Amino acid sequence: MESIGVVAPHTMHFAEPLRLQSGSVLGNYQLVVETYGELNAVRSNAVLVCHALNASHHVAGVYADDPRSTGWWDNMVGPGKPLDTNRFFVIGVNNLGSCFGSTGPMNIDPATGTPYGARFPVVTVEDWVHAQARVADALGIERFAAVMGGSLGGMQALAWSLLYPERVAHCIDIASTPKLSAQNIAFNEVARSAILSDPDFHGGDYYAHGVKPRRGLRVARMIGHITYLSDDDMAEKFGRALRRADGALDAYNFNFDVEFEVESYLRYQGDKFADYFDANTYLLITRALDYFDPAKAFNGDLSAALAHTKAKYLIASFMTDWRFAPARSREIVKALLDNRRSVSYAEIDAPHGHDAFLLDDARYHNLVRAYYERIAEEVGA
């Protein structure tokens, strides 16, 4: 299928202060947005795609100055793809606190004239949703045909259906969870500790020192990446293969250099991540993950938390995902059924672990495609 082609982001500026869940207030702020497809005359075909930890507004297509800059969900969004931009107007928003253009730690704090750094306020999933709602307002979109996301993006989609029940017709929540387990919070804490203990972190003000806590970022990414893959997938990709030049002896070196292919892969992923991501942003986003728990205000009762939702739901999980296991998606499904909501659930046997939501699996994509066919009929797209 063809790509959507060359795209360009645009920056939206907001002067109305945004009060965050923490009580902090952001005054003037900006959000970077990309759109694909055409909004129909009655504005009924808009779909918001929410991004996960290290992604951004750049959902699909490529940039004119970098043909390798393919959007993070390009296999899902585009002409003739499961989310068909010939039929839907698709919006990607870069969240507050990110490092891809929206207001975040790298931006100048008006109060000091220097980058916010660690002074940037902690943000939550709910804060992101409220900011995204202002984007929708600015675009004249009263109601989304669907809000969709995978992983952390799925949490945002679920939060949309809770916070703005009148503005979401369908919620598509993939490889997600209603709250992080203690194990997941622990993974995030270890990753943050790697960053915080890097001598180049400088309390979050490393910009002024002209350095970056690369070592901490590398380790944080390596930890995270392990949790995104399944054991079977890692065994198939790497096994216990040694990293050796062609013709070299298949024997141990008896040192602490890279010995195994899996070590080489993790170091490569860590180095690549440290090149483009910001450490303060990593801290903010993982804390937002930790804090997401819509049932908390209802004494832990997820069914009560979802009682006022009005959307229809597609919930999907992957059998080999141990980061956000299918049991967590089934918790959402049960809570929705307790409230007699319309919900479709699929548990997909894909070998790639948590990252399966990003990959081109035929059964998964056919599921999403079929669901959007239903939405298209409803909105006349």
From Swiss-Prot:
One GO term describing the cellular component: cytoplasm
Catalytic activity: L-homoserine + succinyl-CoA = O-succinyl-L-homoserine + CoA
Pathway: Amino-acid biosynthesis; L-methionine biosynthesis via de novo pathway; O-succinyl-L-homoserine from L-homoserine: step 1/1
Highest taxon in the source lineage: Bacteria
Binding site for substrate: R221, D355
Spans through the membrane: none
GO terms, biological process: homoserine metabolic process; methionine biosynthetic process
Enzyme class: transferase
Keyword Transferase: yes
Active site: S151, D321, H354
UniProt KW keywords: Acyltransferase, Amino-acid biosynthesis, Cytoplasm, Methionine biosynthesis, Transferase
Record function comment: Transfers a succinyl group from succinyl-CoA to L-homoserine, forming succinyl-L-homoserine.
Protein name per its UniProtKB record: Homoserine O-succinyltransferase
Species of the source: Burkholderia pseudomallei (strain 1710b)
